[in-house]
């Protein structure tokens, strides 16, 4: 029986994780749930899964949760704040920590889990985008095991040989017969939109993803392919891959989730329905397998699988991310922070779709790119980039 802390339990990854627990009550027990401000959903989760602890981001939400749980006779202990979240990630009897808090808020709790030597089911993109070197160093020191949840990285992980799986971030790809990693992406809803029309695309149009169901911010990142750019950065860290060992491919059907090319000419791929419960269940049960609740892939119903190289004129954010990796962690952190601000501005209809990439570049050009030495340095770069991005948005929107 694996004991689990879920960081970000009320978000889409958190809910999918709990669904895997629901399908496998004999394999997993929820010890702690950590969330932001969604009290209603947290109440439902606490009543169904009876965790020992529930943590809300702020005191007001925690107070409300406590009252509501007491009314229902729940014995779950309610806490609040970042330190409590970090404590839950490092609890002695917890085996696995699902790191699914979105954004910079997820950094310290994820790092706490790494330092405690846990098995970390990594769904928080920002961890490696902003703290790749710091986190991978901590993984090595504490002998923690990282298991990637993101569907693409999970597909790559499943397609890699065991020596690499057990030494993630440090194993030599070439020594293990790997030539390159093929990262696939759907290309988003504007894959075939004429370039001249991109400026007029609306938030609602950007959020209509053809294959995956996901939140609005990530949907926009899919439309700009910034999500693939961030995944590229993550993959470089996770799999110890050089630029020449990475290939990015557009694959509109999202059936092949990513591939690994080997020296002998073999290419191994992981296929499946586009449902996050598959990679989540894989990481939770690794090295075994459990029922994820996902319906089997029906090959007879598949249309043709197609592939194309990404067009950087259509997806300038992808190119920005690839270039930022070469500049270092200050650049990747600044890009990620700027992108959160610009995407929020686009969703609020303050700027146009094409302004997202232009403003992200503008922020990078204005930042001091000294390499961060600790999480506080990273958070400082993050805060500065957000400030610069806000000013850029205001300049453009006024």
UniProtKB/Swiss-Prot annotation:
Protein name, entry field: 1-deoxy-D-xylulose 5-phosphate reductoisomerase
Record NCBIfam families: Dxr, PRK05447.1-1, PRK12464.1
Known function: Catalyzes the NADPH-dependent rearrangement and reduction of 1-deoxy-D-xylulose-5-phosphate (DXP) to 2-C-methyl-D-erythritol 4-phosphate (MEP).
EC number: 1.1.1.267
Residues given in the record as 1-deoxy-D-xylulose 5-phosphate binding sites: 125, 151-152, 186, 209, 222, 227-228, 231
Annotated GO CC locations: Dxr protein complex
Gene name tied to this protein: dxr
Thermal response of activity: Optimum temperature is 40-60 degrees Celsius.
